[in-house]
């Protein structure tokens, strides 16, 4: 059983599997995003305090959730790569980073758009906003450090160490509204208490979160396939692929 699972860590085994899964995740992402946006923008009621401006949360909150979740998954693969020295683990971490950076940027950008009518300013050095900005810098730093080192194995290990150290920022982002007095509102969705929003609002937000999750998987699989082809370019199995043969 363990051997059967372990064989999926081989790039030549994972490459075709990822290729088959990408279209499915893209379709799921598109369908869920369409449903989530429809519910969020046309079905969910108007907020009695923020009016229509609050609807940006249907993009902002899922992006913020995914920015943290992707970083934790990236750090997990970095840890697996360092402990087990598996090439695919490092490739997965590298493939996740751009999507994580994109989600973090979207969270910051939509947060600024939301903050302008709510707080009267585009940006404040609030604990949650600042720690989310640090998360973006960590993603950029991970990618930059990896690109700056010519030796791939050394680059993998150095960037992985940075990712593991930066993982401490994720709980800071999540608990910042509890640890400090911040302008940012508390969590609307929690595992320990009932949600403080209408059912249709929650449904739209969860659908958008699942759409972001499915998109992130598809994008990461597309990227890791490119990384595999680049790193395994001298392998016989890559030369035999019809998609990389010269016409």
Predicted feature residues:
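Polytopic transmembrane helical bundles with strong interfacial aromatic enrichment
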Residues: 1-247
């Amino acid at each position: 059983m363990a051997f059967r699972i372990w064989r999926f860590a081989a790039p030549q085994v994972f490459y075709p599997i990822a290729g088959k899964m990408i279209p499915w995740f893209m379709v799921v992402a598109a369908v869920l995003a369409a449903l989530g946006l429809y519910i969020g923008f046309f079905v969910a009621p108007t907020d009695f305090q923020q009016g229509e401006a609050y609807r940006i949360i249907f993009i902002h909150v899922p992006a913020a959730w995914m920015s943290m979740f992707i970083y934790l998954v990236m750090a997990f693969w970095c840890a697996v790569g360092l402990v087990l020295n598996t090439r695919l683990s490092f490739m997965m971490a590298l493939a996740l980073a751009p999507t994580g950076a994109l989600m973090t940027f979207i969270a910051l950008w939509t947060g600024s758009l939301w903050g302008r009518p709510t707080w009267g300013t585009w940006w404040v050095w609030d604990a949650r906003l600042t720690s989310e900005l640090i998360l973006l810098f960590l993603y950029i730093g991970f990618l930059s450090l990896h690109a700056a080192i010519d030796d791939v194995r050394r680059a993998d290990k150095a960037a992985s160490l940075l990712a593991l150290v930066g993982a401490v920022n994720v709980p800071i982002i999540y608990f910042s509204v509890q640890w400090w007095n911040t302008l940012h509102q508390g969590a609307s969705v929690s595992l320990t208490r009932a949600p403080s929003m209408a059912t249709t609002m929650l449904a739209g937000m969860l659908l958008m979160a699942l759409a972001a999750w499915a998109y992130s998987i598809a994008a990461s699989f597309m990227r890791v396939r490119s990384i595999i082809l680049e790193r395994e370019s001298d392998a016989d199995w890559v030369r035999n692929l019809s998609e990389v043969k010269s016409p």
